[in-house]
Design a protein with these regions (language model features):
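C-terminal beta-strand-rich structural cap/linker in extracellular carbohydrate-active enzymes
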Residues: 139-165
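Active-site-proximal substrate-binding groove within the catalytic cores of carbohydrate-active enzymes
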Residues: 1-136, 151-153
Length: 165
């Protein structure tokens, strides 16, 4: 992940200084760590202010906390097209966390909608206990086809995730 100009592109190809591009930098980190990707960062520093260091620590700690499920298989919920949410479901039927649902909003407006999520590959068959990134907990009964209907509220140009047990 280039943090500074890499193979040309000028100012448009860099997010340095990082402290002046905090939302962009955080979204890039959320995309990588939320997908279970350990990227190679190209640049002289990972952070240039206490705020950027805080963002790095937030996402590194997220990855460490959920590593077992993030390193598992991935189910794509829908083809990303830039016109609606993008969703990944990480699954690990043998772990404590059976799934981690990562949802991204590429739009400038919030996305609030009911989505259907197939939990078949999590190994769950009756009930799913979900906790979102704000600590809200909910239990949902699985339908006969292993799906749940979930109301999501994804802020603009941001993400929402749910740990599934």
């Amino acid at each position: 992940m280039p943090l500074v100009e890499y193979h040309g592109g000028g100012k448009a190809a860099t997010i340095e200084p990082l402290k002046e591009h905090l939302p962009h930098y955080e979204q890039r980190l959320a995309n990588l760590f939320g997908a279970g990707v350990q990227a190679c960062f190209r640049g002289p520093q990972l952070y240039d202010s206490p705020q950027t260091k805080e963002i790095i620590l937030k996402w590194v700690n997220f990855y460490k906390q959920h590593r077992e499920v993030l390193d598992g298989d991935i189910v794509h919920l829908r083809r990303p097209d830039g016109r609606d949410y993008d969703g990944l479901l990480h699954v690990n039927p043998f772990g404590e966390e059976k799934g981690l649902l990562m949802l991204y909003n590429p739009l400038d407006v919030p996305i609030q909608k009911d989505i259907s999520v197939n939990l078949y590959y999590t190994g769950l068959d009756k009930e799913a206990r979900l906790e979102d990134n704000k600590g809200n907990k909910i239990s949902l009964e699985l339908n006969r086809d292993y799906t749940i209907e979930l109301l999501v509220n994804i802020p603009p140009r941001s993400q929402q995730w749910f740990v599934i047990k």
